């Protein structure tokens, strides 16, 4: 319909259709960019870092719980006495309830990463999105008896329906400003040097507790933070937000 309207308008006023197409394409690009860039705050506010000169940072993990790697991540965090936030996928909880309990009892924060983490989740409406959030929240509540306030959108993509669902569930949307790319790179060195180059006061680092390389890079990151005077704090403390209802 947009293309037909452009052609008719071009015929009526005699302007090259290329000039009429520019604002349409610009608008489309803006929508795509705003949706895909969680730090843009395009549809909703996302807390991605803290404005501070103090050398404090927060660490977060997506896509767990994983029966093999989440316990290894927890062991590393315990060794360095570092808090973290775990954004869990609801469908991964069954069979891993003890890991969820261990995350909580070790003093870490649990956050919502939807129930399915479907590749097509961003096409869901508000009602379906709320079901994704509430089902995961209920599953975690049944284990730790606390309701999660933190929500991280799958793939970091936001939509109007996601924003409406998060508001309805009274969730804080938590993003990041350092993406480790630990799911796309096979090189532990590249992942670590990417983090090392970007680390700064107030940063929120995104990892995934789903692979052996993340466990090794986490050790390197925590060593680097310690050697360079960075303190690891929880996302709640860093962003001054309440993690549970």
Task: Name these PLM-found stretches.
Residues 1-58, 75-85, 197-245:
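Terminal accessory/targeting
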Residues 72-73, 98-102, 161-165, 217-221:
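A short acidic, amphipathic alpha-helical/loop segment
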Residues 74-88, 108-109, 125-157, 164, ...:
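CE4/NodB-like, metal-dependent polysaccharide N-deacetylase domain
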Residues 122-127, 185-187:
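Short, solvent-exposed loop/turn segments at secondary-structure boundaries
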Residues 157-159, 163-198, 230-242:
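His/Asp/Glu-enriched short active-site or ligand-binding loop at hydrolase and phosphoryl-transfer sites
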């Amino acid at each position: 319909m947009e293309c037909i309207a452009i052609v008719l308008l071009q015929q009526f006023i005699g302007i090259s259709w290329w000039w009429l197409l520019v604002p349409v394409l610009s608008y489309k690009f803006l929508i795509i960019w705003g949706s895909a860039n969680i730090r843009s705050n395009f549809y909703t506010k996302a807390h991605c870092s803290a404005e501070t000169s103090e050398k404090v940072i927060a660490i977060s993990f997506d896509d767990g719980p994983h029966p093999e790697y989440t316990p290894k991540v927890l062991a590393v965090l315990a060794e360095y006495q570092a808090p973290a936030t775990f954004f869990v996928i609801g469908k991964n909880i069954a069979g891993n309830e003890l890991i969820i309990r261990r995350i909580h009892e070790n003093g870490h924060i649990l956050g919502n990463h939807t129930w399915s983490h479907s590749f097509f989740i961003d096409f869901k409406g508000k009602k379906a999105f709320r079901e994704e959030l509430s089902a995961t929240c209920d599953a975690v509540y049944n284990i730790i008896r606390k309701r999660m306030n933190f929500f991280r959108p799958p793939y970091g993509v936001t939509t109007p329906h996601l924003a409406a669902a998060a508001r309805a569930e009274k969730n804080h949307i938590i993003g990041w400003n350092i993406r480790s790319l630990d799911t796309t790179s096979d090189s532990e060195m590249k992942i670590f040097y990417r983090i090392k180059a970007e680390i700064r006061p107030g940063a929120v680092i995104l990892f995934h507790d789903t692979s052996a390389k993340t466990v090794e890079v986490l050790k390197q990151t925590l060593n680097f933070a310690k050697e360079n005077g960075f303190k690891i704090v929880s996302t709640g403390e860093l962003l001054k937000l309440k993690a549970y209802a």
